[in-house]
């Protein structure tokens, strides 16, 4: 029974196999058959049929020109599943690395892909760009490009992906995607190709499915193998196999060819397969033959077998269906177990090469299947058993089959079979009635043709094969998307043959809404339904007509506080109240007086070690140290560096003009120059086109609480309130401000002597006294500890040539140089003065014999005389050949400085020398060129106040000063003396440790310490054993010169190499050796006076002896004593360079030399490290008044404060400390001219300044517009003086004020003693602003001042007489509906809208003829619950139903917003005469009249009627105030009910308008300034699109933006979808103006924008340069505000995202972009701009 149970298990799997082989339906899941969706069965271009894995399977051969794609929405209409399985059976061309399936988003981003080859790549990217390119899973060690069939299953679940290959290898990799990943289904699905890649898939594919969930990937293995096993045993059929029977005999059966294809009636013996290796080599479980990738020619005849792992399990008895066609197994060649290249051909008895029946098997015996009778097997003939010949142990050779045996006995009848399949289709029925034509659908919006980069199948032609509804929909969408063109309908094709019976289909997609059916009978009345949900908030309706006055309502909420009433009459004194509860703690009091100085605290903890301080000033040269002992004589050094160029020789005559030399190489890139002056502002450019919409950014963090909103305008005064009940007596008020000094009292008695006062507050720092004499030199300090070794500094700029060093040891002879070009012959130089006598040269050859002289006259014979004098010298002989060069003579005195020679070629970089000691400071050089501006360092210590400088030149007249606060009048006191300096404050608390600083630059060496005693030389240690090779250390100091090496042979000159690329600018090289002498140049300009040379010793003039033979070099003599300085000798010839001398011991620092001549300008130094901030210095003297700064930005207005009750006047407090200046307020409206102010007190005497020139007379300012007429308010008592506000913006010049009273003259101060002129110190960094000094004593009256400026605006005057304007009338009732107006003219065309959504399905085509009725399909499995259908079209109007029962009252809805003002009503009755309006603006100043006569004595002013106390009494209902007739007459006055109603109506409408101003709603009629303001007013709003108007004013220029409240209230402006130029638009597509963007920048503190671009497989992508709105170049290399958010260029296809996040708001938005490698083959695609978001 064990074998039979396996049979049952196998039979249970077979129905699943049948379901799997038909496309959609892995175990019933809603899978997607990608091959069907891409129309593989219709064989598009590049696709043809081939044979699959198992016999009878159909695969598709894909060649290179195939281009297969479909919209993703068509395959996955309900969205792509989160966890899924991707299943495929595929065979690729060997060695191929190509994609199999790729899914792109609407923006062209690759979201999903499977790439086959070595290795296998799985690509995935969700909506948040995760995982990143570096984390994409790669399955290394797997190769699917071997030309064999492979079952591949990919299971994606959660954060991992598993690849299953051939049911054997299973590899899992992490997939770090988002928790809720989403893939965009608005793009396309592409088979076998990438958009940006040329590699395409070539090979065979039999199956490609996408199934939700991961179960299908794990269950596919067993089902696939069982399917192939069934094909092997049963032959190609779709009939369900019968239940297997147990055979009565256990004898293994042989595979025979059936006698007949018809089922035989007589009972026959059942056949059993027996898979034993000796008898049937095809089924061996050994090594299966390798799969060969057939050529196209052999494709039809060869069909590879697949591995059969299931044969290893057990032999299975399975009855063979008698209806199978001929099933043969033939061997070709020497195939089998030992032949790796064997092929097996399974042939079937079909007449056609290919028909659709290959998927279904041969024609089935429907009669047998339907009758339910037992199907008996045919009678078999028993064969003779062949005897296997044993060759070797365990090896068998199969013998030939024996002859057919006799027919066996009839087998027992089989058990009842399962019901057969559906029978053949019946005859064609009569055609049905034509259906009603469907109603036209609504026209769809234009479809998107974003990304369809591949060709699709050809259109038109004969009627194609039967396709599923999904394929038809795909074809329709693809045809529509193909450039949105539709050709004329083709001719009607022939009616196709009826197709074969198909497998049960998967549950279909949701159908479209059907036509409306006929109206059904009216149903019974339903039960009362539950109360519905609260409806959406309706739009505000128009105001209705004014209703009748209602009954008195409940007592309302407390109204707004009214203005303070008039002071009431004094009431009677109340009884003393009970002891009140202790009040809440009072507010913090004002700062008390400074306390006594406490005792000195304990010393604080030692702070952390500070950073290396700045270089100190050079110390005083120390005393000379003790001379050290002479060191041992060192070995001979190696070849020293090339010496400094010698002084040039005498000037040669100018040579002929040489030919122009060849063009030099491009020099290195110069340093960035100083920033130029800003250019003239350009004309404002036109608004650009909007850019592409960016991806939705990730939600940001919630921002900080924003500033308070602007203060609203003051409302109208409310109605006068009823007198309240006497309140509880308030707490004692705070001490008031100090009052003005009263009149001087009478002189008091002499008081008792007071106690000793407290120690006074340290006085301000006095002026520096005269400079004291220089102190004595202090003792030399102890040597400091050895400092830490600094890091190696950067290569410095080459210094100026140093002084000549001592003579060094002679270097070895260098290689001979290349012979130089022979120079032109120079002019003969002047004869040099005689040089010192050289050594005797070799004797020259004998001169030629001179010519014979003329025969002399014979003289008389003289007497023999004595030796006569020498005769005259004979003629000069010819010059002899040049003798060898003599030995170099002794070093001559240095000649005068020659002219500068030509610069030599740069030499090779020498080794790093020893670190030299710091010499004494040299004389100051000339002022060098201005270097680039360094970054501002931290604030240094505050320097001492310098002596007062001489008075400056006459300054320009300053701008008009702001009105100062009124000072307290102090008693005139004598000027006090400067107090002594205060004690030093205590050390502060230890600060928190600072962040670790970067590595500091190498510090300068400190001053030399006293030399230490010389140590005794140590013994030489033994040589250690060689250690392992360590890492390369830092370059050590220069070692002693090594022994001279042997001279190398110069190598042959190599061939000229190819021209290399321009190299990167190298570091500045050391001076090279002198080059060959160049052509003599023209006379240069006169050089500057050089430094005086060292005075040389006078040489002895040697005699000019004959050259002698060279003698041996003698030993080096001891140095002789220095001779006395001789007179300068004659100028000698230029001497040879001496060899480098030994390095001497360091001498003592000499005293500073005299100030030298101005040196050459040095190169600009590198930028120094930022210094530490110094402690705050003492407050300096007040500096001169600086120029007026620009007006600051408008600050936000504060929220309006409620009007408080009038408090009792407090005592005047001490003057408080000066507060920090407040935010600049908005410029106020020009107020009316104030009345003449009271005479101010005499101010402090200022220092006598130089009289300024008279300024030009300004124009009179424009007269202000009269303000709106306000309601007369009750005059309030004068309020307390508020804190001093920030100075407002400079207003227009007011009209000339009356001349002020001349001030009293003040005495001129004495001139102080002139201070000594100090040395000019370095410019210190400006110190922090000191605290405001204490108020000084009142000075003496100043000199007569110029006429004073216009005084401040005085307080508002008393209310004027009533004006003629009446009050606002009552709103009228609603008028009748007007007639519709005439049609207006057509407006201008609107802006281009954004691309629309994908279009709806197009109009239905012409209805074709009705086809033949198809076969009745099998009953499919029950589909899953479909999605809820779309809402149908509205049905016809039903008959009115009966009135239902009264429903349950619904919940009270939210109170709706106030509706807009209603239509103007009809004119009401004429209102009563209104109260007199306020006084108009003051008129212009008239001509001053003559003084009037003295007036009569004054009278008591009666209060105005509005100021008179009103006696009120409350009516019965409390809703009105009934006033006595003596107060105000009734009839429309403010006290009457009609007047109050009108006032309240006006107040309500005003309150709504003010509320909209205070809390804008972000709509087009009520736009906010920024999204930040909107978030502050409405923190509950979600992210979305709202209207903003940054420049306020009229709301017609408001634009729509995206508000990211999640990120704290960012205002995001979208770029326009246009590739020609970058511009920015609102959400409606309208361009955003430059002015609005400027205001948006002013209201923001930072901005950011993302820029992305696609790239393809480059390790170093060319940089993208961006141009900001202020023409700045932005890139990660040039700007610290540009970061690479994601670098996707390292992978095959990726996308690099740059993020520009800058506080320099003028840089954004980005206006242009360029690639450095534009035109490269790897540069594809464009730039995608994200929205620019401003953060307020």
From Swiss-Prot:
Family designation: Belongs to the fibrillar collagen family.
First and last residue of the signal peptide: 1-27
Provenance organism: Mus musculus
SUPFAM superfamilies found in the cross-reference section: Concanavalin A-like lectins/glucanases
Protein name: Collagen alpha-2(XI) chain
Domain Laminin G-like: 57-228
Region of interest: Nonhelical region: 215-486
Localization per Swiss-Prot or TrEMBL: Secreted, Extracellular space, Extracellular matrix
Compositional bias (Gly residues): 994-1003, 1198-1207
Biased amino acid composition, Basic and acidic residues: 765-774, 1232-1241, 1287-1296
Entry binding sites for Ca(2+): 1589, 1591-1592, 1594, 1597
Ranges for domain Collagen-like: 399-447, 487-545, 546-583, 682-737, 868-924, 967-1025, 1026-1055, 1056-1086, 1114-1172, 1393-1447, 1448-1499
CDD domains, A to Z: LamG
GO biological process, one term: collagen fibril organization
Entry keyword annotation includes Secreted: yes
Propeptide position ranges: 1501-1736
């Amino acid at each position: 029974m064990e074998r039979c149970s396996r049979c049952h298990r196998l039979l249970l799997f077979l129905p699943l196999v049948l379901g799997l082989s038909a496309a959609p339906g892995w175990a019933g899941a809603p899978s997607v058959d990608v091959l069907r969706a891409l129309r593989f069965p219709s064989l598009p271009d590049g696709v043809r049929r081939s044979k699959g894995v198992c016999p009878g399977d159909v695969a598709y051969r894909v060649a290179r020109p195939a281009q297969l794609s479909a919209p993703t929405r068509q395959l996955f209409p309900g969205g792509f599943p989160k966890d899924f399985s991707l299943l495929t059976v595929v065979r690729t061309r060997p060695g191929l690395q190509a994609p199999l399936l790729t899914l792109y988003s609407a923006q062209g981003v690759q979201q999903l892909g499977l790439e086959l080859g070595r290795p296998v790549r799985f690509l995935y990217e969700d909506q948040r760009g995760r995982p990143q390119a570096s984390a994409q899973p790669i399955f290394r060690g797997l190769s699917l490009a071997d030309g064999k069939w492979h079952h591949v299953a990919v299971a994606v679940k959660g954060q991992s992906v598993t690849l299953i290959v051939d049911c054997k290898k299973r590899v899992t990799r992490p997939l770090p995607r988002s928790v809720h990943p989403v893939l965009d289904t608005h793009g396309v699905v592409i088979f076998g190709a990438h958009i940006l890649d040329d590699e395409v898939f070539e090979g065979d594919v039999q199956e490609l499915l996408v199934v939700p969930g991961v179960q299908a990937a794990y269950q596919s293995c067993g089902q696939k193998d069982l399917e192939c096993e069934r094909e092997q045993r049963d032959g190609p059929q779709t009939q369900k196999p019968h239940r297997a029977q147990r055979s009565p005999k256990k004898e293994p059966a042989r595979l025979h060819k059936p006698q007949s294809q018809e089922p035989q009636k007589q009972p026959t013996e059942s056949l059993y397969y027996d898979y034993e290796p000796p008898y049937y080599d095809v089924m061996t479980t050994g090594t299966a033959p390798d799969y060969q990738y057939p050529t196209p020619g052999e494709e039809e005849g060869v069909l590879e077998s697949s591995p059969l792992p299931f044969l290893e399990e057990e032999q299975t008895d399975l009855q063979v269906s008698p209806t199978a066609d001929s099933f043969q197994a033939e061997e070709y060649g020497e195939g089998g177990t030992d032949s790796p290249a064997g092929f097996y051909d399974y042939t079937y008895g079909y007449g056609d090469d290919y028909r659709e029946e290959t998927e279904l098997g041969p024609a089935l015996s429907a009669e047998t299947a339907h009758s339910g009778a037992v199907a008996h097997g045919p009678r078999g003939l028993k064969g003779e058993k062949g005897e296997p010949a044993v060759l070797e142990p365990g090896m068998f050779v199969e013998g030939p089959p024996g002859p057919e045996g006799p027919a066996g006995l009839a087998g027992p009848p089989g058990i009842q079979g399962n019901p057969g399949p559906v029978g053949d289709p019946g005859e064609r029925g009569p055609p049905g009635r034509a259906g009603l034509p469907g109603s036209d659908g609504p026209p769809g919006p234009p479809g998107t043709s974003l990304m369809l980069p591949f060709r699709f199948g050809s259109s038109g032609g004969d009627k194609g094969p039967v396709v599923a509804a999904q394929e038809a929909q795909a074809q329709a969408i693809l045809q529509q998307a193909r450039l949105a063109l539709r050709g004329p309908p083709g001719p009607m094709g022939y009616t196709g043959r009826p197709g074969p019976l198909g497998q049960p289909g998967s549950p279909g997609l949701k159908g479209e809404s059907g036509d409306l059916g006929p109206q059904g009978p009216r149903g019974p009345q339903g039960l009362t339904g539950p109360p519905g949900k609260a409806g959406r908030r309706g739009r505000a309706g128009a105001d209705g007509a004014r209703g009748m006055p209602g009954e008195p309502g409940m007592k309302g909420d407390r109204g707004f506080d009214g203005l303070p009433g008039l002071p009431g009459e004094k009431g009677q004194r109340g009884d003393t109240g009970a002891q009140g509860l202790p009040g809440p703690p009072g507010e913090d009091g004002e700062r008390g007086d400074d306390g006594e100085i406490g005792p000195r605290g304990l010393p604080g903890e030692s702070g952390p070690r500070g950073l290396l301080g700045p270089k100190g000033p050079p110390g005083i040269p120390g005393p000379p140290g003790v001379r050290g002992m002479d060191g041992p004589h060192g070995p001979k050094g190696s070849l020293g560096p090339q010496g400094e160029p010698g002084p040039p020789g005498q000037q040669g005559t100018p040579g002929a003009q040489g030919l122009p030399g060849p063009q030099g190489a491009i020099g290195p890139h110069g340093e960035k120059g100083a920033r130029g002056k800003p250019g003239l502002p350009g004309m404002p450019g036109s608004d650009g086109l909007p850019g592409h919409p960016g991806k939705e950014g990730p939600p940001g963090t919630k921002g900080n609480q924003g500033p308070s909103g602007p203060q609203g305008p003051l409302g109208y005064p409310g109605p006068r309130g009823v007198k309240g009940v006497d309140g509880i007596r308030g707490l004692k008020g705070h001490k008031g401000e100090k009052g003005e000094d009263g009149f001087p009292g009478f002189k008091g008695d002499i008081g008792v002597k007071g106690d000793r006062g407290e120690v006074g507050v340290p006085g301000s720092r006095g002026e520096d006294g005269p400079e004291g004499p220089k102190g004595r030199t202090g003792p030399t300090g102890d040597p400091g500890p050895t400092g830490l070794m600094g890091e190696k500094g950067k290569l410095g700029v080459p210094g100026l040539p140093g002084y000549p060093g001592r003579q060094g040891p002679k270097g070895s002879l260098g290689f001979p140089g290349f012979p130089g070009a022979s120079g032109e012959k120079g002019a003969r130089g002047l004869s040099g003065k005689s040089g010192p006598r050289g050594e005797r040269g070799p004797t020259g050859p004998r001169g030629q014999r001179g010519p014979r002289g003329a025969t002399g006259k014979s003289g008389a014979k003289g007497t023999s005389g004595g030796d006569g004098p020498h005769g005259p010298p004979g003629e000069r002989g010819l010059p002899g050949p040049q003798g060898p060069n003599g030995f170099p003579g002794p070093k001559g005195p240095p000649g005068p400085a020659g002219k500068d020679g030509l610069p030599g070629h740069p030499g090779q970089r020498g080794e790093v020398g020893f670190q030299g000691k710091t010499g004494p400071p040299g004389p100051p050089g000339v002022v060098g060129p201005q270097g680039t501006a360094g970054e501002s360092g931290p604030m240094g210590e505050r320097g001492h106040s310098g002596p007062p400088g001489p008075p400056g030149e006459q300054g320009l007249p300053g701008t008009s000063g702001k009105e100062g606060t009124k000072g307290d009048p102090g008693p005139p006191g004598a000027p006090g003396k400067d107090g002594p300096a205060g004690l030093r404050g205590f050390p502060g608390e230890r600060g928190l440790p600072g962040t670790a600083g970067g590595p500091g630059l190498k510090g300068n060496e400190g001053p030399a310490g006293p030399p230490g005693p010389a140590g005794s030389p140590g013994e030489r240690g033994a040589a250690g054993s060689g250690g392992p090779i360590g890492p390369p250390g830092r370059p050590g100091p220069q070692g002693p010169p090594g022994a001279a090496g042997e001279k190398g042979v110069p190598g042959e000159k190599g061939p000229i190499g190819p021209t290399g690329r321009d190299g990167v600018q190298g570091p500045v090289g050391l001076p090279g050796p002198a080059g060959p002498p160049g052509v003599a140049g023209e006379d240069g300009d006169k050089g500057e006076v050089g430094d005086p040379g060292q005075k040389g010793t006078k040489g002895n003039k040697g005699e000019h002896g004959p050259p002698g033979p060279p003698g041996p070099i003698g030993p080096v003599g001891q140095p002789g004593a220095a001779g006395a300085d001789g007179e300068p000798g004659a100028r000698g010839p230029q001497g040879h360079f001496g060899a480098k001398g030994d390095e001497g011991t360091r001498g003592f620092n000499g005293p500073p030399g005299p100030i030298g001549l101005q040196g050459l300008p040095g190169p600009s130094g590198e930028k120094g490290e930022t210094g530490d901030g110094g402690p705050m210095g003492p407050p300096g003297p007040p500096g001169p008044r600086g120029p007026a700064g620009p007006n600051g930005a408008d600050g936000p207005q504060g929220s309006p404060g409620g009007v408080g009750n009038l408090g009792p006047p407090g005592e005047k407090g001490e003057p408080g400390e000066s507060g920090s200046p407040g935010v600049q307020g908005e410029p106020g409206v020009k107020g009316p001219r104030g009345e003449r102010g009271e005479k101010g007190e005499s101010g402090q005497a200022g220092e006598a300044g130089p009289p300024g020139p008279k300024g030009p007379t300004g124009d009179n300012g424009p007269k202000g517009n009269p303000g709106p007429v306000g309601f007369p308010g009750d005059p309030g008592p004068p309020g307390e003086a508020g804190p001093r506000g920030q100075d407002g913006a400079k207003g227009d010049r007011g009209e000339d004020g009356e001349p002020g009273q001349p001030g009293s003259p003040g005495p001129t101060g004495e001139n102080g003693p002139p201070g000594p002129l100090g040395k000019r110190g370095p410019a210190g960094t400006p110190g922090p602003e000191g605290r405001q000094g204490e108020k000084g004593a009142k000075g003496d009256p100043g000199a007569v001042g110029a006429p004073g400026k216009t005084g401040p605006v005085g307080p508002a005057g008393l209310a004027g007489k009533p004006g003629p304007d009446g009050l606002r009338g009552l709103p009228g009732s609603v008028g009748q509906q007007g007639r519709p107006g005439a049609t207006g003219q057509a407006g201008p065309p609107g802006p281009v809208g954004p691309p629309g959504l994908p279009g709806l399905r197009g109009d239905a085509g012409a209805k074709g003829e009705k086809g033949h009725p198809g076969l009745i399909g099998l009953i499919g499995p029950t589909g899953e619950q479909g999605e809820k259908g779309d809402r149908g079209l509205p049905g016809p109007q039903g008959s009115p139903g009966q009135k239902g029962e009264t429903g349950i009252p619904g919940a009270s809805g939210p109170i709706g917003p106030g509706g807009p003002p209603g239509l103007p009503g009809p004119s009401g009755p004429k209102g009563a005469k209104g109260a007199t309006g306020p006084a108009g603006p003051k008129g212009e100043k008239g001509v001053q009249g003559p003084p009037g006569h003295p007036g009569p004595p004054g009278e008591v002013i009666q209060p105005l009627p509005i100021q008179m106390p009103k006696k009120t009494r409350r009516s019965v209902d409390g809703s009105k105030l009934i006033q006595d007739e003596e107060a105000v007459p009734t009839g429309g006055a403010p006290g009457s009910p009609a007047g109050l109603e009108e006032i309240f109506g006006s107040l309500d409408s005003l309150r709504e308008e003010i509320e909209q101003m205070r809390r804008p709603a972000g709509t087009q009629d009520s736009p906010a300034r920024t999204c930040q303001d909107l978030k502050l007013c409405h923190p509950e709003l979600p992210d979305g699109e709202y209207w903003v108007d940054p420049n306020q004013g009229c709301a017609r220029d408001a634009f729509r933006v995206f508000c990211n409240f999640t990120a704290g209230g960012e205002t995001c402006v979208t770029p326009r979808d246009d590739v020609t130029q970058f511009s920015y638009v609102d959400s409606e597509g309208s361009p955003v103006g430059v002015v609005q963007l400027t205001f948006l920048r002013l209201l923001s503190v930072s901005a950011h924008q993302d820029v992305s671009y696609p790239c393809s497989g480059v390790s170093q992508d060319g940089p993208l340069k961006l141009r900001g709105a202020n023409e700045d170049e932005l890139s990660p290399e040039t700007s610290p505000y540009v970061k690479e958010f994601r670098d996707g260029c390292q992978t095959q296809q990726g996308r690099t995202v740059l993020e520009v996040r800058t506080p320099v708001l003028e840089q954004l938005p980005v206006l242009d972009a360029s690639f450095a490698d534009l035109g490269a083959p790897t540069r594809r695609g464009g730039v995608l701009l994200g929205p620019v978001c401003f953060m307020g």
